[in-house]
């Protein structure tokens, strides 16, 4: 049986700050169903770990590793969720904090974590065929397997895959950490290794050292090889393009199912949408909006420029003045954008409701109760929210970039094809025009809207499609493809 260790800095349902946490939970579960012995290694953030799962956590063992000439404790716990075993790396000095990231010693914290993940394999006497690393927090594992642990025979056969969920975050650290954190020399500290502009770049190291590099949509895999999206690594990615693939993320069809979702006031499916109309009224109540039949547009997102929140602010004023519509926004993010949206809410009572918060239950009620879901991201490696919205029969309005381009088929008025709306030029005027077009379809062409809604709801984004592609990747690097 193929053995895979999947490792990342976070995983739902224990803790997540974004899409990475969703993927770390859902993808291994789907790969397991393909007949793979896949296990997951994540840090044990004690303060963030949900109390309801603590009784299921078992202490497995403990050992020490060496950092800067001193022994450092590694506690190893385990928990099983469904069919998947999770290993939890425990060290209070590094992980018993109020947040997951953003600390001055993140280099030490995640350097320690990566070494602990590798060294635990001999302790538990389980050597995987593949280690699947994710984002910068674990991207140095392929480097360490060659530069630090290459002399250990069982590790020499391990192949590595690195998945890039967002190229913006790369893990830059001073060269001194090679010695103080990892205890390795500078042999790979160059442009073909992990050196960049006089610093160590963990993600670059992973790209150069991993046997396979994947990212979370085919379009994003192409985009990051260009200067516009490459975040100064486009040259490295072009050089390594032969081992770069794009695999679109999926969603958990069991969790995101309007027929069974317990967060909703009313359940429904594609054959009977009566519950969705009632969910719209329930959402209007919850967000203190008058119950009207006008189209309801929604956005659930981090309120940042990457997510296009600034573009939405610029587009909303004219759109709200000129159209009988309602808009709901849920999210937190940049303070200036939060304030801009709150100010617009004050100016357009009854039309705009803004909730500066993150509430997963409310998010799912928004997917169900809205008519349109806005995702005007400047760039979007994969995106999950547009898939969730479509599953709930809410048509996406997206910027044609990355995974948004790969998952949403824009409405074609001539053929009637499509399951959403999209725009290419990234400016507020174009977004306003596409919002007007969507409003017009809803208000004036209800049969067209209903047809697009059916297209969206039956589109299959289940993780088993992605899992099959990842399995092909594992087989490729093991020479079994």
Swiss-Prot record:
Question: What single Pfam family name could you report for this chain, choosing any that match?
Answer: Glyco_transf_5
Q: Name one GO biological process term.
A: glycogen biosynthetic process
Q: What are the alphabetically sorted keywords of the record?
A: Glycogen biosynthesis, Glycosyltransferase, Transferase
Query: Lineage of this protein's species?
Result: Bacteria, Bacillati, Bacillota, Bacilli, Lactobacillales
Q: What class of enzyme is it?
A: transferase
> What CDD domains does the record tag this protein with?
GT5_Glycogen_synthase_DULL1-like
Please give the superkingdom of this protein's source: Bacteria
| InterPro entries membership | Glyco_trans_1 (IPR001296), GS/SS (IPR011835), Starch_synth_cat_dom (IPR013534)
Q: In which pathway does it act?
A: Glycan biosynthesis; glycogen biosynthesis
Positions with a binding annotation for ADP-alpha-D-glucose: 16
Family in the record? Belongs to the glycosyltransferase 1 family. Bacterial/plant glycogen synthase subfamily.
Provide the catalytic activity annotation. Answer: [(1->4)-alpha-D-glucosyl](n) + ADP-alpha-D-glucose = [(1->4)-alpha-D-glucosyl](n+1) + ADP + H(+)
Enzyme Commission number: 2.4.1.21
Give the protein's biological function: Synthesizes alpha-1,4-glucan chains using ADP-glucose.
Under what name is this protein listed? Glycogen synthase
Which terms does the record give in the GO molecular function aspect?
A: alpha-1,4-glucan glucosyltransferase (ADP-glucose donor) activity; alpha-1,4-glucan glucosyltransferase (UDP-glucose donor) activity
């Amino acid at each position: 049986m193929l053995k895979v260790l999947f490792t990342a800095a976070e995983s739902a349902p224990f803790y997540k700050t974004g899409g990475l946490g969703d993927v770390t939970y859902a993808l291994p579960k789907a790969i397991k169903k393909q007949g793979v012995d896949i296990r997951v290694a994540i840090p044990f953030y004690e303060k963030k770990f949900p109390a309801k799962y603590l009784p299921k956590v078992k202490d497995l063992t403990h050992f020490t590793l060496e950092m800067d000439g001193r022994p450092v404790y590694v506690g190893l716990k385990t928990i099983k969720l469904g069919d998947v075993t999770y290993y939890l790396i425990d060290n209070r000095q590094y992980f018993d904090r109020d947040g997951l990231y953003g600390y001055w010693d993140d280099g030490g914290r995640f350097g320690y974590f990566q070494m602990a993940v590798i060294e635990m394999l001999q302790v538990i006497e389980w050597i995987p065929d593949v280690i699947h690393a994710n984002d910068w927090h674990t991207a140095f594992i392929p480097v360490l397997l060659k530069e630090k642990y290459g002399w250990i025979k069982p590790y020499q056969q391990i192949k590595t895959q690195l998945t890039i969920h967002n190229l913006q975050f790369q893990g830059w650290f001073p060269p001194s950490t090679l010695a103080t954190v990892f205890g390795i020399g500078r042999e790979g500290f160059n442009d073909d290794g992990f050196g960049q502009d006089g610093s160590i770049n963990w993600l670059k190291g992973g790209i150069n050292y991993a046997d396979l590099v994947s990212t979370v949509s085919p379009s994003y895999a192409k985009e990051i090889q260009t200067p516009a999206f490459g975040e100064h690594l486009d040259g490295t990615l072009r050089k390594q393009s032969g081992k770069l693939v794009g695999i679109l993320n999926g969603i958990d069809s069991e969790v995101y199912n309007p027929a069974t979702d317990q967060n909703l006031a009313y359940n429904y499916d594609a054959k009977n949408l009566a519950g969705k109309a009632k969910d719209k009224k329930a959402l209007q109540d919850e967000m203190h909006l008058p119950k009207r039949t006008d189209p309801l547009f929604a956005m659930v997102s981090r309120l940042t420029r990457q997510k296009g929140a600034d573009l939405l602010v610029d587009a909303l004023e004219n759109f709200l003045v000129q159209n009988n519509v309602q808009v709901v926004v849920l999210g937190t993010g940049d303070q200036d954008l939060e304030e801009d949206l709150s100010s617009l809410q004050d100016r357009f009572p009854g039309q705009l409701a803004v909730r500066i918060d993150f509430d997963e239950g409310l998010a799912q009620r928004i997917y169900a109760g809205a008519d349109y879901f806005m995702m005007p991201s400047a760039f979007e490696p994969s995106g999950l929210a547009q898939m969730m919205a479509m599953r709930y029969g809410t048509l996406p309005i997206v910027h044609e970039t990355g995974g948004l381009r790969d998952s949403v088929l824009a409405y074609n008025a001539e053929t009637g094809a499509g399951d959403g709306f999209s725009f290419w030029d990234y400016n507020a005027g174009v977004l306003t025009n596409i919002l007007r077009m969507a409003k017009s379809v809803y208000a004036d062409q209800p049969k067209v809207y209903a047809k697009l809604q059916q297209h969206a709801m039956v589109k299959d984004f289940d993780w088993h499609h992605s899992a099959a592609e990842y399995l092909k990747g594992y087989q490729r690097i093991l020479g079994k493809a």
